[in-house]
Amino acid sequence: MKTKKNFLNYCHDNAFFGIIQETHLGEMSPGFLVLEGHMRIAFDNDLYLKLQSENIIKRVNQFGDKLYLEFGGKLFDDYHASRVLPGFLPDSKLKMLLTIKDDVEIVIAISAKDIEKNKIRNDIGINYESEVLRLIDAFRSSGLFVGSVCVTQYQDVPVVNTFIKKLNNLGINVYKHYVIEGYPHCIDKIISEDGFGKNDYIKTSHKVVVVTAPGPGSGKMATCLSQLYHENKNGIKAGYAKYETFPIWNLDLKDPINIAYEAATADLADVNMIDPYHLNHYGKLTVNYNRDVEIFPVLKSMFTAIYGKCPYESPTDMGVNMAGFAISDHEASDEASKAEIVRRYYETKVLLRNGKTTENALEKIKLLMQSLNLNEESRHCVLSARKKKEDTGTESMALELSDGTMITAKTSKLLLAPSALILNALKYLAGIPDDIPLLSVQIIEPVSNLKINVLGNRNPRLHVNEVLNALAISATTNPLAQLAISKLHELRGAQALSLIHI
């Protein structure tokens, strides 16, 4: 079940990062606390799809032979967007592409630096190499054509070459783009044989070339620019446009939605800023981010070389994003975005302890929180988790359902805290009294013994996936277990926090 997988991945990577503690069913106290209010829809997804498709088609028709469309964010599962814009569907961008799929070709960019350091996509817990393979399979399964993979900032190191060889063995075309000294400011060198000219020319066969990546900082824009240089040399009139949800250009610079984007990219040191080119030409304030503003002179010079005149007056003009016009409840989006910023703060604290980010990233998020008068407790589940820990004297966890109900669980002998939390949540959703166990000790203990005595694990406590497997087996004879499983989809949109020691 897709919903189950997404929720479990969210729990494992964003709530407690695998360093989870245990809760024993027999010792669970009632954990249902109803808060005022519920999750409000803030975004009209149908309107967004309509507006976005119309705008992309308009941009495609603006250019001649080919359009390079840089896709920012995540195509299949943009959960950041769905968290800060409740009502936004994670696969909206994919649905957009499918409306023009006969004209679309996918190129996936991945940075050699990310391959070398084994960078992880934190929301689903896999490295960028695996994410590239997952994207290829997902695109092809959806009916989209994947033309190639571009390794940007290529370095001749074993781990990078091994990945390239793996792709080649799978029949996937791979191209190399190199580090260009002085990029992005030395325009004369960049637009020369010693710049983009030394990059491989990616051979494409469709009118719309979508350039995407496993995550930010992968070199999507540079890949597009390099291709424009090569297409021009080959006599092909190619254009460029950018499809990125955040920052939302027609919202305020300090809108919580845009600040949440800065929090999400704190490790990249991205900064939202007023687009000076747009302000100078149109006299209007719009929001973009530093990398787009910095690269605009390069783009403008390239377009001037190709067409004699640049078709864009500003970085904002390059974009096609219509998300800002589909926000239906700004108050709800503000609340969701503020909660997301605090969630990113806790996530970054754990990443820092595990050596996977920098102190600067955490300090940046602290400053962003201060700018909106937020603190560590400006998220409902934080208060509930802390109160549970104070009441029980042990590691605790809290989960907020979409209707505002707070579910809690604590550490104990046979179950990890998230495992017990899931069972508590399912019992609440199914209307099962708290004192009725979904899984008996007779079911849990044999699994625990198997882990310790046969598989050699030191921790006897059941993980979430093990508990759900046991629950599924129990459902064949236990109607309550079957009822609980039927409620799994209602965990979509849940917010969780675990207070544990690392």
Regions found by a protein language model. Name each.
Residues 251-294:
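Conserved nucleotide-sensing/catalytic segment adjacent to the nucleotide-binding pocket
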Residues 73-105, 110-126, 248, 252, ...:
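Conserved mixed alpha/beta catalytic, RNA-binding, or beta-rich assembly cores of soluble enzyme
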Residues 35-176:
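Long, basic/Gly/Ser/Thr-rich N-terminal segments
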Residues 208-228:
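Glycine-rich phosphate-binding P-loop
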